[in-house]
Design a protein with these regions (language model features):
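N-terminal Rossmann-fold NAD(P) dinucleotide-binding loop
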Residues: 13-14
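Helical element adjacent to the flavin cofactor pocket in flavoenzyme catalytic cores
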Residues: 173-227, 231
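C-terminal catalytic lobe of FAD-dependent flavoproteins
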Residues: 150, 155, 326-404
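Glycine-rich FAD pyrophosphate-binding loop
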Residues: 22-40
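Active-site substrate-recognition segment that forms the wall
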Residues: 32, 40-89, 213, 229-353
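Glycine-rich phosphate/pyrophosphate-binding beta-alpha loops
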Residues: 47-48, 183, 300-303, 359-372
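Beta1/beta-strand and adjacent pyrophosphate-binding region of the FAD-binding site
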Residues: 1-10
Length: 404
């Protein structure tokens, strides 16, 4: 039995801890236990890459029109400039085509894990009935239909009139709708509780501390240094939204922080959508909760801060109101959130090039639950079997370390 320290408490951290605990390893999960937002919408099927043809031009136009999946505010930060250069290179049709195949491949494997977990813990409500994709512009809906293969089992063209009641509060100015039939959703709070419960049963230890440094000797990490103590282990896995630990060691993960807002609304039962909604032309997502919805805005990179900018939220809500069947938003709660975003749509997963007992499981963006459950097992095998990154075809395929 070896001792393994997992730094972070998001789903990439918890699934990695669980896979290692199942293999009989001694697990230490260290995090500052911040209440960070995690998306329960899983869309690995029929979803384009963030870096794709036209992404750059639409992102800069988005600064004016507020209609872009990624708002880019230029800044002089060297890490951002490097990220931006690589993101620009990857924004091609060929990259998008390849990533769609990889999203599907690894999404299926994560779904298998979540399916099994749902059998044991049905309260996580892993629902594979699909996700609505709603269009507010005729042009974008027509373009999507033109790109759709005949008899595509992964997406269903819906009759807006017959489905309207299922859309909940989104019931105006809808030009078209699809059901992305193979995508899914889950209750993230219940999923987290289930994972923590399993880890407790397996003897994992949870420590509330903020790790700010990894101390090394030679080509190995000796200990993780936190505000409240130091923690020794045989292996360390960084699975948080922290870039400082890797940058202090001279490792560039080709990732930056991206900002987005969540807006929580309290609604009556008939106003809650029957399943998650993606608003195609606003690049927003709507996630049903027990007493309302959580709305997830598009991502912002570059010159960002931690503040809640009410003018941005108000502009977003003013546009959203075109689609709402309610005149007043009751008890709205706003929050600024952050995710690590790679420049090539791939997470940073695998061993550090220099420090062989240090591994990363980071930078999934908003897609953590679509892929982290599977890659937790891939990393666990690397640690348990003493393998290198090159021994894993899946890491070579899907890690940002192996794509410029």
């Amino acid at each position: 039995m070896s001792k393994i320290a997992i730094i972070g408490d998001g789903f990439s951290a918890l699934f990695t801890a669980l896979e290692l605990a199942k293999k009989g390893e001694e697990i230490l999960v260290i995090s500052n236990q911040k209440d960070e937002f995690e998306s329960g919408i899983l869309t690995p099927f029929n979803t384009p890459a963030l870096a794709r043809d036209g992404a750059i031009s639409s992102s800069f136009l988005g600064l004016v029109s507020k209609k872009s999946e990624l708002d880019i505010a230029l800044c002089l930060n060297e890490n951002f400039r490097a990220w931006m250069a690589n993101f620009t290179l990857k924004s091609t049709k060929a990259h998008d085509k390849k990533m769609r195949v990889l999203f599907k491949k690894f999404g299926q494997k994560s779904f298998e894990i979540l399916r099994e977990l749902n059998e044991k813990h049905p309260q996580i409500n892993f629902d594979e009935s699909g996700v609505y994709l709603i269009f507010s512009e005729d042009e974008s809906f027509k373009k999507r239909l033109d790109e759709t293969r005949v008899a595509d089992s992964e997406q269903e063209i819906l009759s807006v009139d017959s489905e309207l009641a299922n859309f909940g509060l989104i019931n105006k100015n809808i030009k078209g709708a699809l059901n992305l039939a193979k995508n899914a959703s889950t209750d993230v709070k219940e999923l987290r509780n289930a994972l923590v419960s399993e880890l407790n049963e397996l003897g994992a230890q949870f420590i509330n501390d903020e790790i700010y440094e990894l101390k090394t000797q030679g080509q190995a990490v000796q200990k993780a240094v936190g505000r409240a103590g130091e923690y020794e282990a045989d292996s360390f896995v960084v699975a948080s939204r922290n870039l400082e630990l890797s940058s202090k060691l001279g490792t560039n993960l080709s990732a930056i922080l991206a900002k987005f807002y969540t807006i929580d609304l309290v609604l009556s039962e008939d106003q809650i959508p029957k399943k998650p909604i993606i608003l195609n032309d606003m690049f927003a997502k709507i996630y049903p909760t027990k007493n309302g919805v959580t709305i997830i805005t598009n991502l912002q990179v570059g010159a960002i801060d931690t503040l809640v900018k009410t003018e941005k939220i108000n502009a977003f809500l003013n546009e959203l109101k075109r689609h709402l069947g309610i005149s007043e938003l009751k008890e709205p709660r706003f929050r600024a959130n952050f995710v690590l975003l790679s420049s090539n749509d791939k997470p940073a997963i695998g061993r550090d090039e220099t420090y062989q007992n240090l591994l990363y499981n980071q930078a999934y963006g908003l897609n953590e639950l679509s892929f982290a459950p599977h890659f937790a097992g891939v990393l666990a095998d690397l640690i348990k079997d003493g393998k290198s990154n090159e021994d894993s075809d899946e890491i070579l395929l899907f890690s940002s370390f192996y794509e410029g």
